[in-house]
C-alpha cells in the first residue's frame, strides 16, 4: 500500500467530537497522486468555481468536478489505500463510498481570509451519521492557522448558513441574512453569531484545531460547525483538497437548488454537465432515502 503505515486508525473522537486528526497518513507517492488530482481540478474549473482577488489576497474554491479525467485521477489516488477499512471500522459500517472532491486555494499576508463558521450540511443535501471529510493540505499549516471545529456541534441542530464580514466578524450589523430562509419549509434556524459570541466569551464552545504537515489528514463530519484556517504573514498560501466519503447510515435531505455565490445559471450548467458526463443515470432520491447511486465509487 502507498501509505506510511497500514495500522492507522481514525479516532472515535470523530463520532463524539465531530473531528479528529490522523498523523502521517499519506506518504510521498500518495501525496503526489492527490496533488495531481488537485492540480487538474484547478486547471479545469467547473461552472460553480468561486474566485476572489483583493490586492494580494486570493481565495478560490471549486467542487463537484464531473470531468471524466477527475474520476480517473481519483481512482488512481485512492487505489490500495485503507481509507474504506478505516472508516468502516470507526463507523461500524459494512460499506463505504467516495462522494466527491472540493479544492481550496487561500493566499493572504494579512490573516483576513478566515472561513465563516458553518456546517457543510447547510449547503448540501446530506443527513445521517456516516459522512466524513478528509481535509488534506499540501502546505504546512501552523497551529494558529488550523481549521477550527466547535466540539460536538455535529450532534446539534441544522442551522441555516449566515455569511459575515471576515474582516470584522464580531460586528453583528455586517452579518448577512439567513441564506435559504423561507426557501426551506420549515425554515432552519439562523446560525448563531459564532464569531461574535466567541470574541465576548472564548469559553462558549470548546474549539478543536490542529496544525498539520503534508501527509496528515483532518477528518470531520460535515455537520460539525467549522471555520477559520486563515493564511497570513508566516503562512501566506494554503492548497487544500477535501475528499468526502459516506457509509451505510447516510441519507438524502432535500435543500433548494443553488449555493453560496452561485447564480441559477451556474447551477443549471453544473447539472447539465453532470448529466452529460454521467456514465450511469443517477438515482432520484426523496427525503429520508438512503444516499446511494451508481456514480459513487465504492471503496469497501
How would you label these PLM feature ranges?
Residues 143-225:
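Double-stranded beta-helix
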Residues 119, 136-140, 149-151:
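Short, structured patches in soluble enzyme cores that scaffold and shape functional sites
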Residues 118-131, 205, 212, 236-237:
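A short beta-loop-beta micro-motif enriched in histidine and acidic residues
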Residues 2-17, 23-117, 122-125, 273-274:
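Non-heme Fe(II)-dependent double-stranded beta-helix
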Residues 44-48, 55, 214-219, 223-300:
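Non-heme Fe(II)/2-oxoglutarate
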Residues 93, 108-111, 140-143, 155, ...:
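Short, charged/polar surface micro-motifs in flexible loops or helix N-caps
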Residues 125-143, 211-214, 219, 244-248:
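Short, conserved beta-strand element in jelly-roll/cupin
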Residues 26-28, 104-105, 122, 140-141, ...:
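Short, solvent-exposed loop/turn segments at secondary-structure junctions
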Amino acid at each position: 500500500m502507498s501509505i506510511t503505515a497500514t495500522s492507522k486508525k481514525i479516532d472515535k473522537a470523530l463520532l463524539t467530537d465531530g473531528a479528529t486528526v490522523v498523523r502521517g497518513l499519506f506518504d510521498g507517492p500518495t501525496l503526489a497522486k492527490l496533488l495531481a488530482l488537485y492540480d487538474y481540478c484547478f486547471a479545469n474549473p467547473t461552472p460553480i468555481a468561486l474566485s476572489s482577488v483583493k490586492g494580494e489576497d486570493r481565495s478560490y474554491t471549486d467542487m463537484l468536478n464531473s470531468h471524466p479525467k477527475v474520476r480517473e485521477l481519483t481512482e488512481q489516488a485512492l487505489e490500495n489505500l485503507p481509507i474504506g477499512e478505516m472508516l468502516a471500522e470507526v463507523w461500524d459500517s459494512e460499506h463505504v463510498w467516495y462522494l466527491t472532491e472540493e479544492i481550496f486555494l487561500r493566499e493572504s499576508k494579512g490573516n483576513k481570509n478566515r472561513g465563516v463558521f458553518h456546517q457543510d450540511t447547510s449547503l448540501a443535501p446530506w443527513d445521517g451519521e456516516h459522512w466524513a471529510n478528509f481535509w488534506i493540505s499540501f502546505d504546512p499549516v501552523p497551529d494558529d492557522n488550523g481549521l477550527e471545529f466547535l466540539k460536538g456541534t455535529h450532534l446539534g441542530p441544522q442551522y441555516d448558513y449566515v455569511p459575515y464580514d471576515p474582516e470584522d466578524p464580531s460586528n453583528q450589523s455586517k452579518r448577512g441574512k439567513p441564506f435559504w430562509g423561507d426557501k426551506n419549509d420549515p425554515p432552519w434556524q439562523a446560525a448563531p453569531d459564532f464569531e461574535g459570541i466567541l470574541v465576548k466569551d472564548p469559553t462558549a464552545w470548546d474549539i478543536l484545531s490542529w496544525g498539520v504537515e503534508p501527509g496528515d489528514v483532518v477528518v470531520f463530519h460535515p455537520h460539525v460547525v467549522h471555520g477559520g484556517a486563515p493564511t497570513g504573514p508566516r503562512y501566506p498560501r494554503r492548497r487544500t483538497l477535501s475528499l468526502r466519503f459516506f457509509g451505510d447510515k447516510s441519507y438524502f435531505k432535500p435543500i433548494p437548488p443553488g449555493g453560496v455565490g452561485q447564480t441559477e445559471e451556474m447551477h443549471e450548467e453544473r447539472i447539465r454537465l453532470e448529466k452529460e458526463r454521467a456514465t450511469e443515470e443517477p438515482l432520484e432520491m426523496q427525503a429520508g432515502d438512503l444516499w446511494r447511486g451508481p456514480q459513487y465509487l465504492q471503496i469497501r
